[in-house]
Amino acid sequence: MIKIRNLEKQDIPSAEYICLITAAREIKDTPKKALRTLLMYNRCYTRTQKSSSFVAENESGRVVGYILCAESLPKYLKSFFGMELQEIFKTGFISGIASFFEAVSPAVFSIKYPAHLHIDILPEYQGQKVGTALMSALKEKLISDNIKGVMLCTGKDNVQAVEFYKKNGFKVIFKLFGAVFMGLNLPQS
């Protein structure tokens, strides 16, 4: 039985492990790339967004997936620029510039979709409704906090992920090169 609960400090190593295990090979195949992946997709969320982030825990207490969410992308970016982006620049100037543009690219949609999420599930737990349970917990939290929409970005070749997001109510809002931006409007209380 999978239990969904809020992310806690002791979950951060597991979340980082899952982030790297599920990342595409080309963004983790060197120590610098692996560090950039953690800084880009994990560490700012786990450092600043614990109240709107959740983990899935199996029956033995192992974290097998997570959903990380910033309820306000502009506030998140301010934190990201203040710490994680600076660390990325230390790994290489080109990597820093690319990361800056990747981080700000969803901002154009943040008026309609102020929240931004990142989700990863260990491969052996995919297809077992773990992602749907995490998504449900996040939607409930965002609705209770009166957040009007949430967005994400995924790769256009990640067909399985795009279908998962569509099944969970997301719609494609924009495509750019290899990226697909998806958004979900949430009911207001």
For each feature predicted by the language model, list its residue ranges.
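A short beta-loop-alpha structural element at the N-terminal edge
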Residues: 2-17
